[in-house]
Amino acid sequence: MGRMHAPGKGISSSALPYRRTPPSWLKTTSEEVVEQIVKLARKGLTPSQIGVTLRNSHGIPQVRFVTGNKILRILKSQGLGPSIPEDLWHLIKKAVAVRKHMETNRKDKDSKFRLILIESRIHRLARYYKTKQQIPPTFKYDSATASTLIA
């Protein structure tokens, strides 16, 4: 899929293995993986950070192949899912950082332009998540209250 505010085509990606079964060398059971996911989530890690930690530290290549469910589904079933989706959260965090930069650097025109692009991405993504019912229909991004959302 192409980029929204850049000319790049975005065709580079990693190739997932065709076999959907866990590797034969992996001795970890599904229950142990779920326990590790819950433990890492209680520490405050995001779903993508949990996936990276499991891959790098515990040698679990794909959680979905081992457990049959994705990390986010496991977290939601345990009641530990994030209140707003991770990609929207990171965009809001970036917008707050740029807005803080704009307070001290008022003449920075490029940052002002980039902030407009970031906020348009936030509005578009929020509209998508409202239709998918992953955020409440009353959710509205407001730059004044955005810092409380990511705190």
From Swiss-Prot:
GO MF, one term, reads:
structural constituent of ribosome
PROSITE patterns cross-referenced by the UniProt entry: RIBOSOMAL_S15 (PS00362)
Alphabetically list the UniProt keywords. Answer: Ribonucleoprotein, Ribosomal protein
Q: Pfam families per the record? A: Ribosomal_S13_N, Ribosomal_S15
SUPFAM superfamilies in UniProt: S15/NS1 RNA-binding domain
Q: Which InterPro entries match?
A: Ribosomal_uS15 (IPR000589), Ribosomal_uS15_arc_euk (IPR023029), Ribosomal_uS15_N (IPR012606), uS15_NS1_RNA-bd_sf (IPR009068)
Q: What's a GO cellular component annotated to this UniProt protein?
A: cytosolic small ribosomal subunit
GO BP of this protein: translation
Instruction: Fetch the HAMAP family from UniProt.
Output: Ribosomal_uS15_A
For this chain, the family text in UniProt reads: Belongs to the universal ribosomal protein uS15 family.
Q: Tell me which NCBIfam families the record gives.
A: PRK08561.1
Q: What is this protein called?
A: Small ribosomal subunit protein uS15
| Organism in which the protein naturally occurs | Agaricus bisporus
The gene that this protein is the product of is RPS13
